[in-house]
């Protein structure tokens, strides 16, 4: 499962750039802290837990068991706290007038809004009182289906304030997906908006909510944010104007003391088949881990402006737009738009405008902007940037090098972060000031994380440093999910059933001679060609390393002789025309980069790839098309541009 050879752009170790002598951790400190976090987790996390304010301090730290049939995860279990107090109230004495949230609207002509910690406190308290007025109590579930607007942050923190459990459904999801999630968690209330602007278009959130609620209990109430002023239908007795109510309630709402193990939120994993899988994160451990990873991974310092470009509908937005930054008293940026609207300079214009210090985005965005050319980056002053981050999928070395050269100017460490919805925060990542990097490698584990590489056939732990296999984690960390909502058996079976005694990430990895980890993609994104196992990420990296390729996605398809063949979807750089000669050149290129075994059997030119709004490529759809089995693609309304699917079907290479 993995690399048969290294792409030409993934060479050398990159030493820590100058200027990071005062980072939170240098190499020696990282090793010392990491060793303690494994050898004495109670002492290590007992100390780190004190970064939060506790109503009742904990006396117990770690109480976890990975034994199949008895899986139980508890951290700080006798402590009592409130997440909203840690994200707001405790900052009011010293930073009431500091900006907590910068809101950058979709339309660049609209002014940005700066929301201070004082204003955030008032808005969250008012929204909490609105929730109480609607009969929401501790433990009740509230579904949030909102655009990337400040009200989404207010809603999350208002739920946390009164002990309600929020479940955000990404604003690009269909009415069916929304209804499934409302029903699965038994939500009493949905918070939505009239419409959601994004890239100059509008998504009809209220209409989608109306359609979803036809399939839910008639007792579910609906709070509506009138965001754009677009005309919407109104169901009297069910729908309530949220902003109007907020003006007519008290700006003070006492926080509800919560046990550390009380659920904070449920987040449904996207793209799962069958019944949605509600990942449960609890209050104490999750918040400690989100705050600590935000501080160390990005070398966050007081006064920094932090921008994570994700949507709050994904875990990245939960941990690194809201909970991590606000627990640390940071200024966090919420961006309603997309990287290419109104043009390919939008990200960089926002960085310049708000003097962003840490910038955290997805490889798919970097590759899309690569394809537009570096001139869009060079138009803007990015001298404020200190740390660059990558999240969501393995970053191919070509994109890493471009990001480093044009965005970071060779001066910003790149933190390529491996983690998951289920992990709550970073698992394997470089730390600025501590970790020399390699383009395409997630490098070293975060504090408290014990990765192991197992043989996928025998499930035996591989002892050699240099090896390849499936990535598992051998012990718990505070940010770990606790269960699947309403289905603990499914939780145990999914994550602890296949490799007993370990948490199974579902990803393959390679560990190199320096002990660095390279994520090779989901184990179900592994192609077995003539008995050779190969991670799709490596073939994609080789293709994207070609100077005329902007993006590539690789899947397997049934092959009469090899068992599986390699099917590549390739998006070319702007201005490059597809041709048979170029197709042959790409096959030759991959043979040179990786080896003959990795040669693509079929290459389809793809002006666009099917992606979720968070930028993840939906390889499930690509596999179906490659297999010439596109009759049951399922719900594609969650894609950023569903239209690309028909184009891919029409131009498929593997016709029966």
UniProtKB/Swiss-Prot annotation:
Residues with the N6-acetyllysine modification: 616
InterPro entries per UniProt: Ac_CoA_lig, ACAS_N, AMP-bd_C, AMP-bd_C_sf, AMP-binding_CS, AMP-dep_synth/lig_dom, ANL_N_sf
List of residues binding CoA: 198-201, 316, 530, 591
Mod. after translation: Acetylated. Deacetylation by the SIR2-homolog deacetylase activates the enzyme.
Binding locations of Mg(2+): 544, 546, 549
One annotated Gene Ontology cellular component of this protein: cytosol
Swiss-Prot/TrEMBL keywords: Acetylation, ATP-binding, Ligase, Magnesium, Metal-binding, Nucleotide-binding
GO biological process, one term: acetyl-CoA biosynthetic process from acetate
EC number annotated for this UniProt entry: 6.2.1.1
Entry-linked Gene3D superfamilies: 3.30.300.30, N-terminal domain of ligase-like (3.40.50.12780)
Binding site for ATP: 392-394, 416-421, 507, 522, 533
One Pfam match: AMP-binding
Family: Belongs to the ATP-dependent AMP-binding enzyme family.
NCBIfam families: Ac_CoA_lig_AcsA, PRK00174.1
Name the record gives this protein: Acetyl-coenzyme A synthetase
């Amino acid at each position: 499962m993995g690399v048969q050879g290294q792409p030409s752009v993934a060479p050398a170790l990159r030493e820590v750039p100058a200027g990071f002598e005062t980072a939170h951790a240098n190499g020696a400190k990282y090793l010392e802290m990491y060793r303690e976090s494994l050898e004495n987790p109670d002492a290590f996390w007992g100390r780190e837990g004190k970064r939060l304010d506790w109503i009742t301090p904990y006396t117990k730290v770690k109480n976890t068991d990975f034994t199949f049939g008895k899986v139980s995860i508890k951290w700080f279990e006798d402590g009592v706290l409130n997440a909203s107090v840690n994200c707001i109230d405790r900052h009011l004495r010293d930073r009431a007038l500091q900006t907590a949230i910068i809101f950058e609207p979709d339309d660049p002509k609209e002014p940005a809004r700066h929301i201070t910690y004082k204003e955030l406190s008032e808005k969250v308290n008012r929204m909490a009182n609105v929730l109480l007025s609607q009969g929401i109590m501790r433990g009740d579930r509230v579904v949030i289906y909102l655009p990337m607007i400040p009200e989404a942050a207010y809603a999350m923190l208002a739920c946390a304030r009164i002990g309600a459990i929020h479940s955000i459904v990404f604003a690009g999801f269909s009415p069916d997906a929304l209804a499934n999630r409302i029903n699965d968690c038994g939500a009493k209330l949905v918070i939505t908006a009239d419409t959601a602007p994004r890239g100059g278009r509008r998504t009809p959130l209220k209409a989608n909510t109306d359609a979803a609620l036809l399939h839910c209990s008639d007792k579910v109430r609906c709070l509506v944010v009138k965001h754009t002023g677009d005309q919407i239908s109104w169901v009297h007795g069910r729908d309530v104007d949220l902003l109007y109510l907020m003006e007519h309630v008290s700006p003070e709402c006492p926080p509800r003391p919560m046990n550390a193990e009380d659920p904070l939120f449920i987040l449904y994993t996207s793209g799962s088949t069958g019944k949605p899988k509600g990942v449960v994160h609890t209050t104490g451990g999750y918040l400690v881990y989100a705050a600590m990873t935000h501080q160390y991974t990005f070398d966050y310092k007081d006064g920094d402006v932090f921008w994570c470009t994700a949507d709050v509908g994904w875990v990245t937005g939960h941990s690194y737009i809201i909970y991590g930054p606000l627990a640390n008293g940071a200024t966090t940026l919420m961006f309603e738009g997309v990287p290419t609207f109104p043009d390919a300079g939008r990200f960089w214009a926002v960085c310049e405008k708000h003097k962003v210090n840490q910038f955290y985005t997805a490889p798919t965005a970097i590759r899309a902007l690569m394809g537009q050319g570096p001139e869009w980056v060079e138009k803007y002053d990015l001298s404020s940037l200190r740390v660059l981050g990558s999240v969501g999928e393995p970053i191919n070395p070509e994109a890493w090098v471009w990001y480093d050269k044009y965005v970071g100017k060779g001066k910003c460490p790149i933190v390529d972060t491996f983690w998951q919805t289920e992990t709550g925060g970073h698992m394997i990542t470089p730390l600025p000031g501590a970790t020399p990097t390699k383009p395409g490698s997630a490098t070293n584990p975060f504090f408290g994380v014990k990765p192991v590489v197992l043989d996928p056939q025998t499930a035996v732990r591989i002892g050699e440093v240099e090896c390849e296999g499936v990535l598992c984690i051998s012990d718990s960390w505070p940010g770990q999910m606790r269960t699947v909502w309403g289905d603990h058996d499914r939780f145990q079976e999914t994550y602890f059933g296949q490799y007993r005694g370990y948490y199974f990430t579902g990803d393959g990895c390679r560990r190199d001679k320096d002990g660095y980890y390279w994520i090779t993609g989901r184990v179900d994104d592994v192609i077995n060609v003539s008995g050779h196992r190969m991670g799709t990420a490596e073939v994609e990296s080789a293709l994207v390393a070609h100077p005329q390729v902007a993006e590539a996605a690789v899947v397997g398809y049934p092959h009469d002789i090899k068992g599986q063949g390699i099917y590549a979807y390739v998006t070319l750089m702007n201005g490059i025309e597809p041709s048979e000669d170029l197709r042959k050149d790409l096959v030759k290129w991959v043979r040179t980069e990786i080896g003959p075994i990795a040669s693509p059997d079929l290459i389809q030119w793809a002006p666009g790839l099917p992606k979720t709004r968070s930028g993840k490529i939906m390889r499930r759809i690509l596999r179906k098309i490659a297999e010439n089995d596109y009759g049951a693609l399922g719900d594609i309304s969650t894609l950023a541009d569903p239209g690309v699917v028909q184009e891919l079907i029409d131009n498929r290479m593997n016709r029966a």
